[in-house]
Amino acid sequence: MDYISTRDPQRTPATFTDILLGGLAPDGGLYLPADYPQVSDDTLTTWRETLTTKGYAALAAEVIKLFVSDIPAEDVEAICARAYTTPTFSTPDIVPVTELDDNLFIGHLSEGPTAAFKDMAMQLLGEFFEYELTRRGETLNILGATSGDTGSAAEYAMRGRPGISVFMLTPAGRMTPFQQAQMFGLDDPNIHNVALDGVFDDCQDIVKAVSNDAEFKQRYRIGAVNSINWARLMAQIVYYISCWIRITDNNAQKVSFSVPTGNFGDICAGHIVRQMGVPIDRLIVATNENNVLDEFFRTGAYRVRSSADTLETSSPSMDISRASNFERFIYDLLGRDATRTAELFSQREGFTLADDSAFPAAAQRYGFLSGSSTHADRVNTIRDTWERLGVMLDPHTADGVRVARGLRDQVDTPIVCLETALPVKFSDTIVEATGREPDLPERFAGIMSAPRHVTDMPNDAAVVKDFIRRTVAG
């Protein structure tokens, strides 16, 4: 399996281990498989049997081996077995699926150590990083940005691993108290939290700026764990397949997915699964008030907001105005035209494809629908689901459920809403909606009172670089 950059007209090939530790391509593009593997009906049957008889880790290994040709198959199997196990995940199913309403399901992705769907990819990424760094005899300094859940998932996946340090940028004051406690309460000499004066997109821009400095990146061994890293998406591919298997009886049955998203990472994995030939019907983009992606799928205009225009909402992990993974989909939508993709994404204020002949394919060929949700929508959905069904949703998952219900008349297949996090991470909104505090899983007892470890910084890439430089030097 070769990988190519979305901005490279020459389609220069790279292997999985070439791109694993780096994140962005040297030209600033994002990596994708040169060709998506195509799965047969026999393969789908084998995967169904594997999940049923051997479990999630075994299914993950079979899927991931399609994308990783330069690591021995038995090593991939061992890596997956270490990543997806109990008690790291609180259930042996790893990703259970339950029915919420008639033909509306929840794919439970928050059974990992930080109670967020990001654990699904990060636990695997941690195992791959340690494997490859050990093989090379190298070290790595991970630089990431988080709007809430990526940071804690990355830190819990990487802590204690030899040769790995984490520098995680967060938007100051824009995470919930629980999210801050999860990250800033982690006491590990190789974990470095930075509270940046800005919003998530400012954090992400600094990550990209540092990654684009080839000399600095090479000298200080900078790696990435944000969803710009291909391995994150590769891991997410697996749970689309497992959810499809769990609610179907045969390979002819299709399933749709409603995905709360701001960065277009999680749903991009669904797009790839659909391109592989797995029977997925519609992919529903569910946004909050920061509806950049919903606006694109409705109008063809991708209109990037400024930091000042990025709203602070009650589903904060989606408070994003520039979707860093969107380039991967646009590359496919434009027939993998790298030159045009590079031109479009060099326009910092966005672009429009409203009059482009390719735009209708977003819905017609690639199956996308979209919708947005407000604070009132979230609160009402959480309250209704709790009072009527006895199920408590976090605000992001509530966005996904609300949008899925609103588009129900356009979807003829069962819909799986992918859970974002457990409600405990967003207690203020849960209390507003239900009048009660969400349950605190036992593994988080005492987290709110732990000492904090965080460094405040201005929105300045040079300052962040200097902090990395001084920290690495010791």
Language-model segments: what does each one mean?
Residues 1-474:
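PLP-dependent amino-acid enzyme catalytic core
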